[in-house]
Amino acid sequence: MIVPHRLKTTTSRNVIWDYSYKHDKINRTEEGDLRIVRFAIQGKAKYGVIQGDNISSLRGTPFTGFAGPGSSLALDGNSYQLAEVRLLPPCLASKIVGLGLNYRSHAEETKFSIPAVPLIFIKPSTAVIGPDDEIVLPRFFRRVDYEGELGVVMGKKAKNVPKDRARDYVLGYTCVNDVSERYAQKEDGQWTRAKGFDTFAPIGPWIETEIEPDNLKIETYLNKELRQSAYTADLIFGVYDLISFISGIMTLLPGDIIATGTPSGIGPMNPGDVVEVRINKIGTLRNFVVGQK
């Protein structure tokens, strides 16, 4: 068992996390960020924090007692090597709230008008898969597209949250691939079937806490070829606007994810493909595309 004195931090403009292990807790009192991971070891799912090539596991979940800046995370005293665990979806979302046409470039490539208010839809929790899991294309599929996106992970229950308080409700950020069947989307006139198939919501590889979401570079690669590239500064509706808007419609629960929309460059995937969503300061979400057996 490895119990480090201090986790490596990266600087941020805000007062965020202290990683010193004091009485089995990590206290959020200094600048820096924290990488939270969910993983499987010996048939059990656990949450932990990453330090180098090791994971220090948590007692319970990162949502337990989360109250925004100033919260702490309780450790259970165990440490594991990254190589010996399997990474899981980084949280258990009750729902994923997706955004359509939230990049000007994507609205232009699809020949839709810029929306006056956020265009939202729901992806079910049964669509969620984790890093290195398989995206399974349905038997009848005609065109299934990748959509690389920034995901916002809610840290606590949010209802009618004003924009200037929205940051206090965010646990962190992750990568999302909003997989979509284009013909079903066109035929139905609404998006539930097109975006709701099992495995159509890859998320991961972990949750990066307290980074600034307003100028992150997001890229999508298909078979190592760059297909999408943009900055979150180009979002039509920013992260805190979205939290305020969505929480005024529905209650967001701890672990829920807001998928903030995809930039231009969407395109089809086929069995045998490998798709990667990369966001600087977060990491890479990789998945393998297969046909339904």
Where are these regions (language model features)?
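N-terminal amphipathic/hydrophobic targeting modules at extreme N-termini
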Residues: I2-P4
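N-terminal non-catalytic cap/leader segment that marks the start of a structured domain
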Residues: E30-P118, I211, E219, E225, ...
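Catalytic-pocket segment enriched in acidic/His residues
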Residues: S79-Y80, P90, H106, R182-K293
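Structural signature of FAD isoalloxazine-binding scaffolds in flavoprotein oxidoreductases
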Residues: S113-P131, Y146, E276-K281
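Residue-level recognition of short, solvent-exposed, well-ordered loop/turn junctions
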Residues: G130, D145-E147, L253, N270-P271
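A structural-propensity feature for long, helix-poor, extended segments
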Residues: P131-G151
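N-terminal accessory regions of nucleic-acid-interacting proteins
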Residues: K159-Y173
